[in-house]
Amino acid sequence: MSRRCELTAKGPQVGHKVSHSNIKTKRRFLPNLCNVTFISDALGRNVRLRVSTNAIKSVDHNGGLDAYLMKANAAALSPRALELKRAIEKKAAEAAPVAKAS
């Protein structure tokens, strides 16, 4: 399992640990990742993803997983998240003609 957010593609960064005597040694800054279960209203099921805490805030801000994925850039999403996005778009397209007919 890689240390990369499935929604925002945040990954490890490299920097320096600087001692008191100003000696620099390489270190890695790892993203704050959490295993989170989101509820997809369009799909009608729970979706478990490994995302950064920043992504959790973004999903909340956009009004849920479905709304976030509809707005998200496909290049930043993991293959699993991209499959979810396509499935949600497909469900939304199926539901749209029914809403217009009523």
Swiss-Prot record:
Entry superkingdom: Bacteria
Cysteine-cysteine disulfides: none
Listed InterPro entries: Ribosomal_bL28, Ribosomal_bL28/bL31-like_sf, Ribosomal_bL28_bact-type, Ribosomal_bL28_sf
Segments of this protein annotated with the region Disordered: 1-20
Entry GO CC: cytosolic large ribosomal subunit
Keywords: Ribonucleoprotein, Ribosomal protein
GO MF annotations, alphabetized: structural constituent of ribosome
Signal peptide (residue range): none
This protein's record includes keyword Ribosomal protein: yes
Homology family: Belongs to the bacterial ribosomal protein bL28 family.
Name of the protein in question: Large ribosomal subunit protein bL28
Organism: Bradyrhizobium sp. (strain ORS 278)
Encoding gene (name): rpmB
